[in-house]
C-alpha cells in the first residue's frame, strides 16, 4: 500500500462521514414535516480500500432524534480519525520527499 492509497482511503472515510452528517442534519431539520421519512446512510467497504455510501429512505415515518444525535457524533469522530490518518500520510510523504532530495 502506498501513501496515495492511504490518503485516498482516508479521504473516502471523510467523505462518508460528511454524507452521514448531512443526512442526520437533514433528518433533524425535517422531523416536524408531515409524512417525513428519515434518510439513512449505508456504508460499504470498497475492494482495494475505502468506503462508499448510499442514501436510502427509511420505511418508518417520523423522527428519531436520538438516532440522529448518535449518527452526528459517530460522523464527527469518524471524520476526525480519518483526518488524522490523512495528515499522518501527508507528513510521511513529505518526510520521504525530504530524504530523496
Predicted regions and their residues:
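Amphipathic alpha-helical polymerization modules
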Residues: 1-101
Amino acid at each position: 500500500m502506498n501513501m496515495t492509497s492511504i490518503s485516498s482511503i482516508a479521504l473516502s472515510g471523510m467523505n462518508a462521514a460528511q454524507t452521514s452528517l448531512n443526512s442526520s442534519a437533514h433528518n433533524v431539520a425535517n422531523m416536524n414535516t408531515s409524512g417525513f421519512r428519515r434518510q439513512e446512510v449505508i456504508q460499504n467497504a470498497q475492494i482495494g480500500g475505502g468506503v462508499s455510501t448510499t442514501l436510502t429512505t427509511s420505511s418508518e415515518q417520523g423522527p428519531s432524534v436520538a438516532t440522529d444525535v448518535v449518527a452526528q457524533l459517530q460522523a464527527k469522530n469518524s471524520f476526525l480519525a480519518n483526518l488524522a490518518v490523512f495528515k499522518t500520510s501527508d507528513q510521511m510523504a513529505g518526510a520521504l520527499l525530504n530524504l530523496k532530495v
